[in-house]
Amino acid sequence: MPTIVEELVRKKCAPCEGGIAPLTDAQVAPMLKGLSGWQRDGIKIVKEYKFKDHYQAQAFTNAVMWVSHREDHHPYLIVGYNTVKVEFWTHAIEGLSENDFICAAKVDSLLDL
């Protein structure tokens, strides 16, 4: 039986232009629990990645941008010398949607390559 993360990685983000409610705490909890290192921060999910140097941080940032472009769901990124902070939330609903967790799982999977 696949894990929640494996299921999320297989999914594709659905267009969201509003008109739906953000996920409830009960819906968020199992997905957040399945994602390693992600934290809820109000209406966002957030994770900070650390790398050996700036080159690795920048390469990871480019890979995150590739994932977000393919999914048409874009994070807020804060890039430091050897860190990248990634924040996902669904702007159209001012909260969390399944798209945020799909992208978080896909971003995490970049490090498994």
From Swiss-Prot:
Q: Which reaction does it catalyse?
A: (4aS,6R)-4a-hydroxy-L-erythro-5,6,7,8-tetrahydrobiopterin = (6R)-L-erythro-6,7-dihydrobiopterin + H2O
GO terms (molecular function) for this protein are:
4-alpha-hydroxytetrahydrobiopterin dehydratase activity
Which keywords describe this protein according to UniProt? Lyase
Q: What class of enzyme is it?
A: lyase
Respond yes or no to whether keyword Lyase is given for this record.
yes
**Single GO BP term:** tetrahydrobiopterin biosynthetic process
Similarity-based family: Belongs to the pterin-4-alpha-carbinolamine dehydratase family.
Cross-referenced HAMAP family: Pterin_4_alpha
Put simply, this protein is called Putative pterin-4-alpha-carbinolamine dehydratase
Q: Which organism is it from?
A: Thiobacillus denitrificans (strain ATCC 25259 / T1)
